[in-house]
Amino acid sequence: EPIVITKIELYPYEEEPTYEEFLAQKLSEGIKVIDKLGDGVIKIQAECPTLVSNACLYPINDRTSSLTEPQDPQKIKFNIVNSTTVNQWMQYKVTVPEDGLYTIAIRFRQNDLIGMFTSRRILINNELQFQEASTIRFKYNSGWQSAVANDGAQNFTFYLKKGENTVTFETVLGDMTDYVYRVEQLIDSLNAAYKQMLQLTGPTPDSYRDYGFNRLVPDAVQTIRDAAVELYEIADELEEITGELGDQVATLNTIAILFETMGDDEYEIAPNFVTFKNYIIALSNWLYAALNQPLKVDYFTVQGTEDPLPKAKSNFFESIGFEIRAFIGSFYMDYTTVDFKTDEVYSEENTVEMWITSALGRDDALITRNLVDTYFTPESGITVKMKVITTGLTEAILAGIGPDIASMSSVDTIT
């Protein structure tokens, strides 16, 4: 692709201070640590960012907890945001009453990477205040959690000036960067070893034949042996970091056991050659999973160090009350209508009706609903009533009671 460069400037590299250095510097400047905001705790809904790096970062609905905000037992409300891809970011505006060092507490859910953690980088006013802010961890748990921004060892405070500030959450690999690089190097070397052995054995080796691997391809055998040692080290380090043996760590241990067996005994290579290839593929899948950093966020708060954390999980009575209201509402809710935003400036004359066939799915209807509310209605002043239907579109049109707009799948034909 063509590119035009007008100017190149070189700057000296300046490393960010550690958190201890950052904290000592701010305290020496007379900036105080905010202990309590009390009722003045600032809450920012994650589904309402000021800026996003990519259009695929959009709010979604979550009904797994009655505490998720905003929540409704019958209606679908966009109340969380889910980001997974590295280098994507979301920025929010935060206004604080005074200069100081504040904590940032997040209500989140990380239930995708079992036994692992995902990472985020937090920028304040587009600046990384200290090194550890690039490795904010969110550990695995099947339910919702609340935690102050931390690196797994200590909680952090961030400097915010009086008035408006920006807080940016960027998806990063964090402490997983080194492990991703090491596994990537292993996959390359193991693929090379596999190709060397494949030249001797063919795709389906004879399990009872002596191929002389140690004599003909000693480097390939040594590569497998070294890979086993490296995988054991990575698994042990990850288990030490996370404090538990999750699926990702167990996968590495399982692969390492086979590699160790093949590396120590060349007669085990041919019988396990097909499995060896599949385990290289499994390592690639592990790498792909590690490159994704899924995290669902409900909201975050800017608060004092002594302010209580946001409530993460609802109690029994809150949960059962929410489910009862949802059950009762199911008897009178109109599930065919994808509701529209009401606004007094829009009249009935400026309203059109749109029917969507169920073959396209409710997800498509929600996407269309979001596009209409975000772009079409504000620009045109026309609201759209949307309904998801199963059958009867042709009959309704022939009877003269059809919609203004119909969105059909390829199997629906009207002549």
Predicted features, each with a name:
Residues 114, 360, 364, 368, ...:
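Extracytoplasmic/periplasmic, Sec-exported soluble proteins
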Residues 366, 370-378, 395:
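Solvent-exposed, polar/charged alpha-helical surfaces in well-ordered, non-transmembrane soluble domains
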Residues 25-29, 346-349, 355-356, 364-367:
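N-terminal targeting or signal-anchor segments and their processing/structural boundaries
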Residues 275-347:
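Extracytoplasmic ectodomains of secretory-pathway proteins
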Residues 358, 386-415:
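Ligand-binding clamshell of periplasmic/extracellular solute-binding protein-like
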Residues 1-302:
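Extracytoplasmic
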Residues 347-361, 376, 382-387, 405:
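Short, well-ordered beta-strand elements
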Residues 160, 345-349, 398-400:
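Extracellular/periplasmic catalytic domains that process cell-envelope and extracellular macromolecules
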